[in-house]
């Protein structure tokens, strides 16, 4: 009987801890403090004349007054990130040297407070991930995946997607095109679908390595759910990522987008 009581008590404590843990994930918390200043206007970037029709239309919809020159971009917001079936609120800062490097600062929140921090960096073809369980540096699969992430995130500074000479667009239909960037394997090519009514990107899909050491790539979806204007450019304010037929594991809610900050 004493053993049963101990077992029951242990189970109650575990259940209580699990309930408390779940409750902590229901409090979103605040995004990062915003004190980065304002975007700097560096003029307009000319739109290439050889883009597919759907891509040209997209460019005119997202930047009706012309594409701004973008050297750096800062994207700040909140997120919902799911790991092993448990969804955490999070906040993030993405720093980009447009088309070249990125730095990700992501914090998972519990009861609104940061409990886990992730740092990710990509530069000179090398990805670095600093996680609570260790570091991953210069892994071939992670390097390849990071390059794809770099360009998928350029949807928040579309001047790079549309004008960088390393980005090669090919028309595949009235409302679709492919995007292959220098350095990517051909099978990593993005398929980009545009909404027939708005002309905006509906989703980008590709094959991407999911884990270090993977021998095969997994179908990767980047889906846009909502668009808003920041700095005269229409970019995704809500977007999500999923693998294959899985439920989305990341949902981003963008609060600020800045270009060419000091």
Region roles according to the model:
Residues 3-21:
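Hydrophobic alpha-helical topogenic segments used for membrane insertion/localization
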Residues 15-33:
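Membrane-interface motif at the C-terminal end of an N-terminal transmembrane signal
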Residues 28-74:
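N-terminal leader/targeting segments and the immediate start of mature chains
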Residues 56-135:
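N-terminal mature ectodomain segment of secretory-pathway/periplasmic proteins
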Residues 69-76, 98-105, 172-180, 201-203, ...:
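Short, hydrophobic/aromatic-rich segments at coil-to-beta transitions
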Residues 128-183, 214-215:
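Flexible, processing/modification-adjacent segments and terminal tails
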């Amino acid at each position: 009987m004493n053993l049963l009581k101990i077992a029951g008590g242990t189970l109650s404590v575990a259940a209580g801890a699990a309930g408390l843990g779940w409750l902590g994930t229901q409090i979103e918390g605040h995004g990062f403090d915003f004190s980065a200043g304002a975007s700097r206007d560096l003029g307009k970037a000319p739109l290439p004349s050889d883009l597919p029709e759907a891509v040209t239309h997209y460019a005119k919809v997202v930047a009706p007054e012309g594409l701004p020159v973008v050297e750096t971009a800062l994207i700040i917001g909140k997120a919902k990130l799911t790991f092993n079936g448990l969804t955490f609120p999070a906040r993030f800062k993405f720093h980009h040297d447009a088309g070249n490097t990125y730095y990700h600062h992501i914090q998972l929140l519990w009861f609104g407070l940061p409990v886990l921090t992730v740092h990710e960096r990509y530069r000179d073809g090398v990805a670095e991930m600093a996680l609570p369980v260790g570091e991953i540096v210069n892994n071939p699969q992670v390097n390849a995946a990071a390059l794809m992430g770099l360009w998928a995130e350029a949807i928040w500074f579309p001047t790079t997607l549309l004008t960088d000479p390393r980005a090669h667009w090919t028309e595949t239909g009235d409302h679709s095109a492919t995007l292959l960037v220098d350095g990517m394997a051909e099978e990593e090519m993005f398929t980009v679908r545009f909404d027939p009514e708005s002309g905006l990107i509906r989703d980008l899909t590709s094959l991407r390595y999911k884990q270090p050491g993977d021998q095969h790539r997994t179908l990767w979806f980047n889906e846009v759910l909502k668009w808003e204007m920041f700095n005269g450019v229409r970019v995704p304010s809500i977007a999500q990522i999923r693998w294959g037929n899985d439920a989305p594991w990341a949902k981003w809610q963008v609060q600020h987008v800045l270009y060419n900050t000091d």
